[in-house]
Amino acid sequence: MLNSAMSVVILAAGKGTRMYSDIPKVLHTLAGKPMVQHVIDAATKLGAAQVHLVYGHGGELLKQTLKDDKLNWVLQAEQLGTGHAMQQAAPFFSDDEDILMLYGDVPLISVETLQRLRDAKPQGGIGLLTVKLDDPSGYGRITRENGKVTGIVEHKDATDEQRQIQEINTGILIANGADLKRWLSKLTNNNAQGEYYITDIIALAYQEGREIAAVHPARISETDGVNNRLQLSRLERIYQAEQAEKLLLSGVMLRDPARFDLRGTLYCGMDVEIDANVIIEGYVTLGHRVKIGAGCIIKNSVIGDDCEISPYSVVEDAHLEAACTIGPFARLRPGAELLAGAHVGNFVEMKKARLGKGSKAGHLTYLGDAEIGDNVNIGAGTITCNYDGANKFKTVIGDDVFVGSDTQLVAPVTVGKGATIAAGTTVTRNVADNELVLSRVPQVHKQGWQRPVKKK
């Protein structure tokens, strides 16, 4: 039966010794964000009125990283078991709300599974998430009597007969706040580990005649926890395979789904093609018929219709209008903007710069803090000299300008419409419309000159 109010407790106090890291275990990333953030996001989407985060090791780093004003931080100074962790959070529970218990190192739990668990929770009882494993070694076993759940026995406390049970406890459960506080107050540490097990509340509820409803997740991987980097890497591949499958089924052509990483949110138009070893980070939008070449990294960017990004290009915090072409080996840094039909070629870098409609920067160029008009040609080796060691300055280039190769534009400087900058020129003053500008050292010819010969 579904109550109108629900809060979530996320257990995240473990040190994660087997990660061999100074970083708290739950802050290790999966798909580009901390494991615990995945769990917080699921709780938020589920409609949690309050999220209580039980922390211990690395608490300050957790707070600095998560920076969520809506979290209620609950300290577990000593790690004395899951029951003890829940006891620390219990004073914050309202009697008339449901409490859902989650884990910061179980990052793939889905909102859909949690919603089914919430819906299945009996009035006055417990909703319990369980799975069946071929090899349940090390897990708490679900005990039943006449089909009804009667309790959970931890592996170290189980008899040989109980160890044959394949249904195991995932640790995820939901119960009423008042009931949970009562059961938590009755927990003891009379077990092999000397800890307070949250699982003991199942037997307490059964003894009171309360119903325990067991629910299975859509996928077993949803309940897989992380204790070491190998397990984390396996969950990463599971997650990425699921994302790739969703994209393929929605019409996106991934040339090699096993070599695609989504570390954020991707919105795609029709007939998008993505080659191998592409990484998508943050919020990325790809318009219709966009093609992304192998080895590209796209982060927090909008790519317009019919754009093509050639292999090994990096695009970050950039905006491309329709029919732009990028790369190979191009880099668009934050603030780069390409208007329709613009081209940025190999080994070109842009930062806080706008390239106008139909304009081209073909090779070996740096455009920083620049505003470039339409139909401009930027020759190879052009550099906007935007930094004087203390401050940044802007370069403005009008429409229909031709900039020859190996040109330096020393900002602040403006080049008027239709101007031509000869190859090898250093521009230090403003250029008027339709002017030709050139600066070169005299060319010297020495007839009969002999090249030096190496001494033997």
UniProtKB/Swiss-Prot annotation:
| Residues annotated as binding acetyl-CoA | 380, 386-387, 405, 423, 440
The organism's place on the tree of life at top rank:
Bacteria
- Quickly give the catalysed reaction: alpha-D-glucosamine 1-phosphate + acetyl-CoA = N-acetyl-alpha-D-glucosamine 1-phosphate + CoA + H(+); N-acetyl-alpha-D-glucosamine 1-phosphate + UTP + H(+) = UDP-N-acetyl-alpha-D-glucosamine + diphosphate
Required co-factor(s) are:
Mg(2+)
Identification of the protein by name: Bifunctional protein GlmU
Q: Where in the cell is it found?
A: Cytoplasm
Protein's gene: glmU
- Identify the main location: cytoplasm
- Pathway annotation: Nucleotide-sugar biosynthesis; UDP-N-acetyl-alpha-D-glucosamine biosynthesis; N-acetyl-alpha-D-glucosamine 1-phosphate from alpha-D-glucosamine 6-phosphate (route II): step 2/2; Nucleotide-sugar biosynthesis; UDP-N-acetyl-alpha-D-glucosamine biosynthesis; UDP-N-acetyl-alpha-D-glucosamine from N-acetyl-alpha-D-glucosamine 1-phosphate: step 1/1; Bacterial outer membrane biogenesis; LPS lipid A biosynthesis
Q: Which residues bind UDP-N-acetyl-alpha-D-glucosamine?
A: 11-14, 25, 76, 81-82, 103-105, 140, 154, 169, 227, 333, 351, 366, 377
Q: What is its EC number?
A: 2.7.7.23, 2.3.1.157
Give the cofactor note.
Answer: Binds 1 Mg(2+) ion per subunit.
Question: What does the entry list as the binding residues for Mg(2+)?
Answer: 105, 227
Q: Where is the active site?
A: 363 (proton acceptor)
Please provide the record's keywords in A-Z order.
Answer: Acyltransferase, Cell shape, Cell wall biogenesis/degradation, Cytoplasm, Magnesium, Metal-binding, Multifunctional enzyme, Nucleotidyltransferase, Peptidoglycan synthesis, Repeat, Transferase
Segments for region (N-acetyltransferase) = 251-456
Q: Which residues form the signal peptide?
A: none
What role does this protein play? Catalyzes the last two sequential reactions in the de novo biosynthetic pathway for UDP-N-acetylglucosamine (UDP-GlcNAc). The C-terminal domain catalyzes the transfer of acetyl group from acetyl coenzyme A to glucosamine-1-phosphate (GlcN-1-P) to produce N-acetylglucosamine-1-phosphate (GlcNAc-1-P), which is converted into UDP-GlcNAc by the transfer of uridine 5-monophosphate (from uridine 5-triphosphate), a reaction catalyzed by the N-terminal domain.
